[in-house]
Structure formats: structure tokens, C-alpha cells
Amino acid sequence: DCLLSRGLGDVYKRQPTFTLNGRLIIVMWMSGHPGNRRQWKAEMMTAATHLACVARSQSMGNGIPGLQKRKKRIMKMVLFYTLHTTKRRRNMKKQGFGTTKDGKEALLYTLSNKNGMEISVTDYGAHLVSVLVPDKDGKKRDVVLGFDSVTGYETDGSHFGATIGRNGNRIAGAAFELHGKTYQLAKNENNNNLHSGPDGYDYRLWNVEEADDSAVTFVLMSPDGDQGFPGNFEVSVTYTLTDENAVEIHYEGSCDQDTVVNMTNHSYFNLAGHDAGSIENQTLVLKAEQFSPVIDSASIPIGEHAPVQGTPMDFTSEKAIGAEIEADFEQLKLTGGYDHNFILDKAVEGSIELMAVASCKESGITMEAFTDLPCVQFYAGNFIAPVTGCLLYTSPSPRDKRQS
């Protein structure tokens, strides 16, 4: 039946719906994907979450056309950031964000919610550019690090707010083996590959598939052999700002071959504001009782898990980020501070659960981070001076010392 009869507005009146386990499902037609592949997008809309799954359109029969799962090569990851602050109509703004080195125009999309919170994202690298949050006094603070135009993102190597792909984090020796074949990647950090090399997805202009008052979806086609990875890989990333002050980041992708995929967002957070100085007095809780020790300063894990208890790596209870960062502890000395993988205490594998809580007493801003992945990399911004911010990006568990 029609969503108009459910009181959800004229804009949805052509969209078919049904209910599942007491939840309303909206079926929306998606087009414009490379290769003209037809797809249906089924979205569950609840007060606090936005969960999406994609299915290939196989038939036009009765009921929900083609609502069949794709083959095994489906990648879906979800990351939520919820910022708590101390009513306004939604709207989306689109404006120029400068011109790239090859003469293409980049665009900036700004979303706002009824609480006065705003986020800005750009089609260049699908970057999260800014997150403006009212503090305890109602003053807006930009709590992520970034630049005012596309030029900064083209020239800086810190990956502020970047959508990293095809693989986030490090691959030792810049090579991996899959099904008996060795794939060589670019060596862009010592002898290793970091964030897929110098031609990462964050240095490309993405296509905008959808943009409305609450969400923007960027899409990219990465061909077989791109960056050295096998398979034609189609990926989308959707940024959503909710009225619950949640920034939701959804990744969806498919590939025609087995490949390595580890998409992530690379935003640095300073909850006092991007220009407020040190984060050492801001506090952090990580839902992780184990971490991955590294071999050396290259931050490649040794392939084992170690307990955080009794070490400076223990953030299981609230602790200032700078409290033990200079402790006489080998792992911190190797990496110049925190730059380690933490294994999350997941109640249910693959479920969306709280992974971290960061707080700033001075601003009154608290951020909760949720993910459906098993690990989080915590980087305290050891080498991004003069600005300061901490980075939390999610990932699968490192399999051995070959991959971080």
C-alpha cells in the first residue's frame, strides 16, 4: 500500500511498502549503477537506526519484485557516531568546493537537523568535511579536522575525513596472496602499503547517486586491477544525519571476483573544536579488553592478541587520552603514541554495538561510536601536528603480521 496512508508524506506515495516483524519496510527503486544493473533497495526505518540491504532485481512478479540476496560477494558495513549536546527545520545545501588539479568541480553538501547540528560532505574522496555541534552553551563547534576547499584534500596526506578504499590500514610488504596468487601493491609507507597507496579512493571524484535533506550517497566504480586489487568493485557510501544527532555511515559494495575489501572512514575528532588545541585531557572509553601488539614502528601486528589490563592500552573505563601516552611501555614507544588495533568485546558477531565513548568536559560534548565490525584502530594523531585530534576507524580483525 502507499506510505501516504501511513502519514509519512506525499514524497513517498509511489513507494511500495510492507511490514516485517512489526517494522515498516520501504522499497525504493535505485538506478544509475554501472552496467545498468537493476537493483532494489529495502530500507528499515526506525526511530534510532537506518539499516539497508541491497538485492538484485530478478523478476517483476507479485509481492516484492526480486527481493533475493545477492551472491556471497556483498560487503556491508555500518558506523554510527552519536553526539550528545545540551528546533529547527531540515534542509540540504549544495555549493562549490573548489576545482581539482585536473579541472573538475568538487561540490560540498551540507545537512542539518532540528537540533542545529550540521555535517558537510564532499564528492571529492567522499570526505566528511565538518561536523558542527552545539556545545553546552549552544555555541557551534566543528569537531572534526578538515579543510575549507578541495585543494587541501588533494595535497595533504593525513586523510582527514576520508573514505578509505579499497583497503584501509597497512599491508606488510605491500603484497598479499589470494587463492595462490600474489598481488603486488604500491609501497607508500616505508616498505608497506598504507590505505591502498597514493591513488586511494579519497583522491577521486565520486558520483552523487542521491542527495536529500537527511542523507547523501556517493558511488564509485573501481575496475579490475585498480591499485593492484583483483575484481571490478562497485561501492557506495551514504552519510545520514538524524534528528537524534547521529552521523550514520553505510558502505555497500559488490565485486565480480574474490578480493580484499576493507572500507573505512578516517575522521579525526577534537570534541573541543578543530582549532581548540590538545586532546590530551579529553576522555575515551574503548569496549575492548584485547589489542594487537605491533612488530615495530611500522605498526604491523605480530599476529597475536594481548590483554589491555594493567597496561596503558586499557581504556575499558573512562581515561584521559594523554594520561599514559608517554608511559614507559614498549608498544607506545614503537609507534610514538597510540596507533593500535583493538579487538572489540562483541556480544553478537556482526551486530551493531557500542565501540567507544569520547567526551570533552570543557565543551560538554560526548560522542558515542557504534559499528558492526569486530575491531577498531585507535590513533591519537601522533604525527599530525600542529593540529590535534584522535582517530577511531573500524576494520576486520588483522589475520596475521602481513596485514594491519
Each language-model region and where it sits:
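Intrinsic disorder/low-complexity segments enriched in small, polar and charged residues
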Residues: 19-22, 55, 60-65
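Serine residues within intrinsically disordered or low-complexity segments
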Residues: 31, 57-59, 397
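Alpha-helix boundary/capping motif
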Residues: 31, 46-47
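Short hydrophobic targeting helices and cationic amphipathic motifs
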Residues: 34-37, 51, 81
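Short, Lys/Arg-enriched N-terminal segments with co-localized hydrophobic residues
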Residues: 70-74, 80-91
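An exposed, glycine/acidic-rich loop-and-rim segment of catalytic or binding clefts
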Residues: 92-395
